Amino acid sequence: MAGPGVPGAPAARWKRHIVRQLRLRDRTQKALFLELVPAYNHLLEKAELLDKFSKKLQPEPNSVTPTTHQGPWEESELDSDQVPSLVALRVKWQEEEEGLRLVCGEMAYQVVEKGAALGTLESELQQRQSRLAALEARVAQLREARAQQAQQVEEWRAQNAVQRAAYEALRAHVGLREAALRRLQEEARDLLERLVQRKARAAAERNLRNERRERAKQARVSQELKKAAKRTVSISEGPDTLGDGMRERRETLALAPEPEPLEKEACEKWKRPFRSASATSLTLSHCVDVVKGLLDFKKRRGHSIGGAPEQRYQIIPVCVAARLPTRAQDVLDAHLSEVNAVRFGPNSSLLATGGADRLIHLWNVVGSRLEANQTLEGAGGSITSVDFDPSGYQVLAATYNQAAQLWKVGEAQSKETLSGHKDKVTAAKFKLTRHQAVTGSRDRTVKEWDLGRAYCSRTINVLSYCNDVVCGDHIIISGHNDQKIRFWDSRGPHCTQVIPVQGRVTSLSLSHDQLHLLSCSRDNTLKVIDLRVSNIRQVFRADGFKCGSDWTKAVFSPDRSYALAGSCDGALYIWDVDTGKLESRLQGPHCAAVNAVAWCYSGSHMVSVDQGRKVVLWQ
């Protein structure tokens, strides 16, 4: 037989397959014919025997028939017993033949049945053989697939081993990096602490030098005053008689912009103590009072922590009486999304709006229209608060990117970023100087900033979120989420007073005389607090008034005669501060909750902004 590698191998395989199939068929079908074949052979033997016996008996009738024609004398010669025996034998053989025929018929019927059964079994065998072949092919496929799967599993195991090794290496590397990061953070904290301590020492030294210089100046002036008290001084009305201090005061007043007709009268009243007609006959005591006033003015100017001189801007009262708005004059879709903050500049003709689109738009109020002036860009998050410095040349904004940012009017990009908070900054306000600011945040801190160096000079830790802040001469007032208003002395480290209110505080507004504070809270009320006695003087409510958010702003009118706030239904509510009654309800073009309102310093118009991108000018 040819080997498996030669060309005759396929022919040998199918021959062996046929032999195996025949042997299998012989084993399975042999048992069915073990009884049938011997019986059939026995039947054939009997049939052959009967055939032979029949052939022997065939001539006997011929031999018997002639005897019937013999005469009577011949019948006597036959044996009387021979004829019955032959007849009986024939009958017997006929009976046996019939029985054998029946047996042959039965056997033939059984052969037919067995043949039919054999055909059925052969068809079943073929079906089973075909099914077995299909199953064998399927088994071969499954074995091949199993081999492939096993190979793939081995490959995956190898890849997993490689990945595990790489992961362990990366884990070790990350551990080293984290350890290095912790060391660097500790070093950074140490450096920051040393830097803060060094800056604090430097600030203390500067303050000490300034204090010594001030004490020396006061001592020198005191000596000069003592010398001047011993002689009589005659002062004329000329411009040089009041000394350098008076000239400086006049120069400061000369820098202010020329007032409007209504402002001139107030300015003249404000300047009148320095231009009195009795100046030609001043006595020595009057001269001393004037010099002391000038010295007190210089002392109030002071210096910042960093040593840079602070300018205080006198707010000239230009609002004789605020006028209630009656109608909307201009409506603009100013921002791409909701508008959160609005503020008028000191000259009442410049307006700033800030929104969730990270932009601050400056507008000129021209008659009864708002005209676009400039767009301030570069904010790192949604604008939550805007404020002008006393000169009107800088804009400070609080943003959601954990910082406050400073712009100069006329420059589109941010000038300075005040970073240090750990959560959203909700309020940012200038103090009464352009060099200092205060911010409040949701990280439960209030921070004071020296803007000359962009340095946090003080951090106040509070127990609740800060939603708004306002600043006085020497006081910082903050409104919080725990339904409390806190007062902080800028010259001391601790809280000086806490006033509880019902509802989370959303905004604060300080009157121009710094004697009254207006708060808005989520209990849908406005409260007027008298700062002289530190108690709540008035509570304003109205049917339909409801705060729309945690940053809804309410403001005083410039003359403190009215309180203004916007509601979630888009209406504006105005209360009379003296009587506590609702003076007016303005239902205008707002279709969404009003977030903030602003009343210009002249009292002639106001602006409201809402969550639907609208800015509305009222007059």
Swiss-Prot record:
Mainly localized where?
cytoplasm
Task: Tell me the segments the record calls region Disordered.
Answer: 57-78
UniProt KW keywords: Coiled coil, Cytoplasm, Protein transport, Repeat, Transport, WD repeat
Q: What is this protein called?
A: Protein Atg16l2
* Regions annotated as coiled coil: 116-227
Q: Which InterPro entries match?
A: ATG16 (IPR045160), Autophagy-rel_prot_16_dom (IPR013923), G-protein_beta_WD-40_rep (IPR020472), WD40/YVTN_repeat-like_dom_sf (IPR015943), WD40_repeat_CS (IPR019775), WD40_repeat_dom_sf (IPR036322), WD40_rpt (IPR001680)
SMART domains annotated for this entry?
A: WD40
Q: Name one GO biological process term.
A: autophagosome assembly
Residue ranges of the WD repeats are: 334-373, 378-417, 420-454, 455-498, 500-539, 546-585, 589-619
Entry's localization field: Cytoplasm, Cytosol
Q: Name one GO cellular component term.
A: cytosol
Q: What does this protein do?
A: May play a role in regulating epithelial homeostasis in an ATG16L1-dependent manner.
**Could you say which protein family the record assigns here?**
Belongs to the WD repeat ATG16 family.
In its miscellaneous comment, the UniProt entry states: Although ATG16L2 is structurally similar to ATG16L1 and is likewise able to form a complex with the autophagy proteins ATG5 and ATG12, overexpression and knockdown studies in mouse suggest that ATG16L2 is not essential for canonical autophagy.
What is known about its subunit structure? Homooligomer. Heterooligomer with ATG16L1. Interacts with ATG5. Self-oligomerizes to form a 800-kDa complex composed of ATG12-ATG5 and ATG16L2. Interacts with RAB33B.
Polar residues composition bias: residue spans:
60-70
